[in-house]
Swiss-Prot record:
<dbReference type="GO" id="GO:0005886">
    <property type="term" value="C:plasma membrane"/>
</dbReference>
<feature type="transmembrane region" description="Helical">
    <location>
        <begin position="420"/>
        <end position="440"/>
    </location>
</feature>
<dbReference type="Pfam" id="PF12832">
    <property type="entry name" value="MFS_1_like"/>
</dbReference>
<feature type="transmembrane region" description="Helical">
    <location>
        <begin position="520"/>
        <end position="540"/>
    </location>
</feature>
<dbReference type="InterPro" id="IPR024989">
    <property type="entry name" value="MFS_assoc_dom"/>
</dbReference>
<feature type="transmembrane region" description="Helical">
    <location>
        <begin position="271"/>
        <end position="291"/>
    </location>
</feature>
<feature type="transmembrane region" description="Helical">
    <location>
        <begin position="485"/>
        <end position="507"/>
    </location>
</feature>
<feature type="transmembrane region" description="Helical">
    <location>
        <begin position="222"/>
        <end position="242"/>
    </location>
</feature>
<feature type="transmembrane region" description="Helical">
    <location>
        <begin position="453"/>
        <end position="470"/>
    </location>
</feature>
<comment type="similarity">
    <text>Belongs to the major facilitator superfamily. MFSD6 family.</text>
</comment>
<feature type="transmembrane region" description="Helical">
    <location>
        <begin position="15"/>
        <end position="35"/>
    </location>
</feature>
<feature type="compositionally biased region" description="Polar residues">
    <location>
        <begin position="597"/>
        <end position="606"/>
    </location>
</feature>
<protein>
    <recommendedName>
        <fullName>Major facilitator superfamily domain-containing protein 6-B</fullName>
    </recommendedName>
</protein>
<feature type="transmembrane region" description="Helical">
    <location>
        <begin position="75"/>
        <end position="95"/>
    </location>
</feature>
<feature type="transmembrane region" description="Helical">
    <location>
        <begin position="546"/>
        <end position="566"/>
    </location>
</feature>
<dbReference type="GO" id="GO:0042590">
    <property type="term" value="P:antigen processing and presentation of exogenous peptide antigen via MHC class I"/>
</dbReference>
<keyword id="KW-1133">Transmembrane helix</keyword>
Length: 747
């Protein structure tokens, strides 16, 4: 499954923008919708169990990855997955909530007491009476407590009115406030009244009735099972969307897969814009829900259907963009051939499938007549190895931490008196840091390598978790929110690029599905679910502290394993170098043609012998793309050493050139001996080569015999002598002039 060359990066950016915008817009608001549908009856249910359904069900992504790779139906699976996102998740937003009713809570103290006081006509002294003096006559209460229960009211007195009734009052008085009230003493007044009766009625309520809103439990259970069924089916069929998009994006990038972050950043940008705009829109909406009964204070309900409407529109746009993708199944074979030529794609698979002696130059394979098929057992052999298995474990652990922070960070900050404004600022900083991290991820990977990016992510996680665990003021968490980009965005980009370079193109969708299932599915699901259990038993701060220590231990173990793997590779390379057959003698043989060939090939062997291990690693054509690159300071130091070696080599070449000129002048024969120089030269050549190496004596009879019939001029032999000694081995450059000078004197 590969996009054709007509594809443009704008299509990938648009699809990632709409797709990830909708997914991350729907995920946080799903819990709010479940609460509004009646899940308040089950406290904390959305916080602990909802992430499990949304994350663990992402483990279906490997299954759909296998289907897309096996049947070469990548585009069909992608379109069907996006369509399932639209159908199933939009349906959740239109589920009607359960019926609500308002009921009262039984009061814990005495019900209202009505007291009626009748006065008879006549002139007499009337004293103000209080409810507490009669209601609590046995046993008598002290004066301060009585003062708290005396009503503060005025009596309307009129001599011309037949009946005067005091206003009916309901008052709630707390006994603990008795000491703060002013004590009132009974007052006596003389009021002349006619033959009438006055009725005084007062009602005192010790506590106002409390009313709560309850949901119909049967309807809540029905809605819960319905939403659960929709989530399970929808997530199972919609899980491979992100996996296939990531795979197609990586295959479009080709050898520039490190630039995946530049494409992925558009998804984070869309997420931030959508959460900000839709959140403000929902906050400004108010809806009224019918509640049976009276007495309840109507809560302020928000219209969360807006989020699902926006989700449906934007996901439909993503579906339209996905139809513009062109998948070419035949491109698998050409991609494999291209990867073999550049020797950077699948080193592990090539070493295990092909023999070490075969090469593409010796046996070229036509992709149309003899394509290579990689079974799934090769994929499992790769990912189950120590090198890639540890990387996948780190991906799961980072997903575990991200799921825990995503679920319980704001909970912990709320316990520290954090406000919603703080939560908004934290979200903005997190999105900005992710955008920046995705934008520079390829530069960071080129600078330090994939494995060291994982080191940095684990170290930042350790510092972030430990810092949060010791917080006393919620606002000082803001500096650590900047690390969100390094702990999530950079690690995710490095894992995708690293694993993509390790598997053949035909299995990349399956590999990306496994990575997504471990990081986004199982990792974040376990972080949300197990995090809730740990928070209940130990508390939020202690759980953050324990997670920070676990991150530190993971960093140490992972770095130790990678170091041991590097040592084993060096030992294997040394053993292979020892087993390479070396010529018995690199000394040139006494023939003109062989002298010329050896003279041209000797500088290469000399330069190779002077190369350091760092230079060999940099110039190794079999070096995979995922191997950790050298540090910048090592490269600078190596460049300085190279410059120094070049300067020293030029000086040595000048000295050797002067020595060769002097040797030519001293070893040149006199002109009078030209007639008889052919025979002595033929006899002297074996003597010269006999002293040049232990293996050259075996070639003396063979090489000197064909040379004798050829009457070559002395000038040609003299011209070849400097070529033979142009690059002599160490230890052989000085004896040669002495041998050539003493040879004529022996005759």
């Amino acid at each position: 499954m590969l996009c054709s060359n007509r594809q443009s990066s704008l299509d990938f950016q648009d699809l990632l923008f709409f797709l990830l915008l909708c997914i991350w817009l729907f995920t946080p608001l799903a819990s709010c919708v479940l609460q509004a549908a009646g899940n308040d009856t089950y406290p904390k249910w959305p916080t602990r169990w909802d992430p499990l359904f949304y994350r663990v069900l992402q483990c279906s992504a490997p299954f759909w990855g296998f289907v897309a790779d096996r049947f070469k139906k990548g585009k069909a699976v992608l379109l069907f997955s996006v369509l399932c996102w639209v159908v199933f998740n939009c349906g959740i937003g239109f589920v009607k909530p359960a019926a609500m009713s308002c009921v009262s809570v039984d009061p814990t103290v005495q019900s209202p007491v009505n007291f009626t006081n009748y006065t008879h006509a006549g002139n007499h002294t009337r004293q103000r009476r209080y409810l507490t003096e009669d209601a609590y006559a046995n046993p008598p209460l002290s004066q301060p407590i009585l003062a708290a229960y005396r009503p503060h009211s005025r009596y309307i007195r009129s001599a011309n009115t037949n009946t005067t009734s005091a206003p009916f009052r309901n008052s709630t008085v707390d006994i603990s406030m008795a000491s703060n009230l002013t004590t009132m003493s009974p007052s006596a007044t003389k009021v002349p009244l006619k033959s009438t009766s006055t009725m005084e009625t007062q009602a005192i309520t010790a506590k106002v009735k409390q009313y709560i809103i309850i949901f119909n439990k049967e309807q809540v259970d029905t809605i819960f099972l319905l939403i659960l069924l929709v989530i399970i089916i929808g997530e199972f069929f919609s899980a491979p969307a992100v996996t296939i998009v990531d795979t197609v994006t990586l295959q479009y990038l080709g050898q520039n897969r490190d630039r995946y972050g530049l494409q992925r950043m558009w998804g984070s940008l869309g997420w931030g814009i959508a959460m900000l705009s839709v959140g403000i829109w929902i906050d400004n909406t108010h809806i009224t829900i019918f509640i049976q009964g009276l007495g309840c204070v109507l809560p302020d309900y928000k219209n969360y259907q807006i989020a699902f409407i926006v989700f449906g529109v934007l996901m439909t746009s993503a579906l339209i963009v996905a139809t513009q993708f062109h998948f070419d199944n035949r491109a698998y074979q050409s991609d494999e051939e291209e990867d073999k030529k550049e020797d950077v794609e699948i080193p592990q698979v090539i070493q295990e499938v092909s023999s070490p002696e075969s090469s593409s130059d010796d046996a070229p394979v036509c992709p149309e007549t003899n394509p290579q098929h990689f079974p799934f057992k090769d994929l499992f052999r790769i990912i189950c190895g120590v090198r890639y298995g540890t990387v996948l474990f780190v991906a799961w652990f980072m997903g575990f931490g991200y799921g825990f922070v995503f679920t319980f960070l704001f909970w912990h900050l709320e316990d520290l008196k954090g406000t919603t404004t703080l939560f908004g600022i934290c979200s903005v900083l997190s999105h900005i840091s992710e955008l920046a991290a995705y934008f520079i991820s390829h530069k960071l990977i080129e600078l330090v390598g994939h494995i060291r990016v994982l080191y940095i992510g684990l170290a930042c996680n350790t510092a972030r978790y430990l810092y949060i665990s010791y917080l006393e003021n919620a606002w000082i968490v803001l500096p650590m929110e900047v690390l969100q980009g390094l702990t999530h965005a950079s690690v995710w980009a490095a894992c995708i690029s690293y694993l993509s370079a390790a598997v053949p193109p035909a299995l990349r969708t399956s590999a990306q599905g496994i990575l997504q299932g471990l990081h986004l599915g199982l990792g974040r699901g376990c972080g949300a679910m197990l995090g809730g259990v740990f928070v209940n038993f130990f508390g939020a701060a202690e759980t953050f502290r324990g997670l920070g220590m676990a991150s530190l231990v993971t960093l140490l173990i992972f770095s130790l394993i990678q170091w041991l793997l590097g040592q084993n590779e060096e030992k294997k390379g040394a053993m292979l170098a020892e087993n390479i057959p070396v010529p018995s003698s690199p000394v040139p043989i006494a023939t003109i043609d062989l002298v010329q060939n050896q003279s041209t090939s000797q500088p290469n062997s000399d330069s190779k012998s002077r190369k350091t291990r760092h230079q060999e690693e940099q110039e190794d054509p079999n070096k995979p793309a995922w191997v950790v690159s050298a540090s910048p300071w090592v490269t600078i130091a190596f460049a300085l050493y190279q410059i120094r070696d070049m300067v020293a080599q030029t000086k040595n070449n000048d000295c050797q050139g002067q020595q060769e000129r002097s040797e030519q002048q001293t070893s040149a024969a006199p002109p009078g001996d030209e007639s008889t120089s052919s025979q002595p030269n033929a006899s002297s050549s074996p003597v010269e080569y006999a002293f040049q190496g232990p293996a050259s004596s075996a070639f003396v009879p063979q090489n000197t015999h064909p040379v004798r019939p050829v009457a070559e001029p002395p000038s040609s032999t003299e011209a070849k002598e400097p070529v033979e000694n142009s690059t002599p081995l160490p230890g052989h450059s000085k004896p040669l002039p002495a041998i050539t000078q003493t040879q004529p004197t022996t005759h």
